[in-house]
A protein has these predicted regions:
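A short SAM/SAH-binding and catalytic strip from SAM-dependent methyltransferases
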Residues: 154-178
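N-terminal auxiliary segments of SAM/dcSAM-dependent transferases
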Residues: 1-27, 35
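Class I SAM-dependent methyltransferase SAM/SAH-binding core
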Residues: 89-138
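Conserved class I S-adenosyl-L-methionine
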Residues: 71-80
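Substrate-binding/catalytic lobe of Class I Rossmann-like enzymes that use SAM or dcSAM, i.e.
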Residues: 205-287, 295-301
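Conserved beta-strand signature within the Rossmann-like core of class I S-adenosyl-L-methionine
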Residues: 184-198
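A short glycine-rich, Lys/Arg-flanked "PGG" loop and its adjoining helix->strand segment in the class I
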Residues: 175-187
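Class I SAM-dependent methyltransferase Rossmann-like catalytic core
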Residues: 21-67
Length: 324
């Protein structure tokens, strides 16, 4: 925990010291409470990505698997509650008697509850939760398979990355991330990635400003976490949630906007931080994609684009990639 907190502290100091735009890495939004709040966001009527992606999986889960001839081992990056993955569970178990499933998530407590629930309800699914970041989590999965004498030429790993999480990366970061995933795959493996597509601006902005206020709570929770874990003294009532579409960058941006001129501290740091009225802390971005940008990203990352599965409105795409 000390090492994790030290990394947390270092990242926060770097982000909040930027004179052009204060920022906080979005991965720190997902502590146990943040993960819970995000699950609440996904069921709000304004938040189209989850239900749209779920409808694609419900309709096409069998088709998604049709090019995979070998036994499937399923690895999910950022598994959350694994609700959407159920459609793949059902389709995979029509092809094979049992399934080895490795959910990877940075929230250990949230992951633990999901694993226990899955093991209770699905006798044919062997679940091993991996509490780690995505790339190290995939490496952990590969090590577990190797240590348990799995023959890598006898099965295909299907790695899934749902929820348009790829959009939380800067474009170059997304390329580097997919390259790192590619380095841990072989030519029998597949990668299924969710992409939120560019669409009506109002629809996109509405999804990140739900009436129930869960997205605002989710955003503000990072300040609570910093108060608790880093000894900060943020007054949450002096910040408001802001989310909007940046047309130039093709992305939704989430910010915390200061209501007044303020000062705050970080325990163990010998400086006082200042933030002006109207100034923001950038907490998350979500890039929206076109087909052309998806194709370019795949090629630059070392993948071939095998197939695209979309909803009737083309709001969301599930893209099957294969190492080349």
């Amino acid at each position: 925990m000390e090492n994790n907190n030290e990394e947390f502290r270092t990242d926060i100091l770097k982000g909040l010291s930027n004179p052009i735009q204060k920022s906080i890495p979005s991965k720190y939004l997902y502590d146990s409470k943040g993960s819970y709040l995000f699950e609440q966001i996904t069921v709000q009527p304004e938040y189209y990505p989850t239900r749209t992606e779920n409808s694609i999986l419900e309709e096409y889960s069998t088709n998604i698997l049709h090019n995979i001839s070998k036994e499937i081992i399923l690895i999910e990056m950022g598994s959350g509650s694994s609700k959407k993955t159920k459609h793949l569970f059902d389709s995979i178990l029509k092809k094979q008697d049992k399934l080895y499933y490795f959910p990877i998530d940075i929230s250990f407590n949230f992951l633990d509850s999901v694993v226990n629930d899955l093991e209770t309800k699905n006798q044919n699914i062997r679940v091993k939760g991996i509490p780690n970041d995505y790339i190290n989590g995939i490496k952990d999965c590969n090590n577990i398979l190797f240590e348990n004498n799995f023959k890598f030429d006898s099965f295909s790993r299907l790695i899934v990355f749902f929820g348009s999480s790829i959009g939380n990366f800067e474009i170059d970061e997304a390329r580097d991330f997919l390259k790192a995933v590619r380095m841990n795959m072989n030519d029998k493996d597949f990668l299924l990635v969710g992409f939120d597509m560019i669409k009506d601006e109002f629809l996109m902005e509405h999804a990140y400003n739900d009436k129930a206020g869960f997205t605002a709570q989710f955003n503000l929770n990072i300040l609570s976490r910093m108060n608790r874990e880093l000894g900060c003294n943020f007054d949450l009532s002096e910040y408001i949630h802001s989310a909007f579409f940046n047309k130039k960058e093709d992305r939704i941006e989430m910010h915390l906007k200061s209501k007044s001129d303020q000062e705050f501290i970080i325990s163990g740091c010998d400086r006082i931080f200042k933030i002006s009225q109207g100034e923001t802390i950038h907490t998350e971005r979500s890039y929206k994609y076109s087909i052309e940008k998806i194709q370019e990203l795949a090629i630059r990352s070392g993948f071939t684009l095998e197939e695209i599965f979309s909803d009737k409105n083309n709001w969301f795409n599930l893209v099957m990639l294969k190492p080349c």
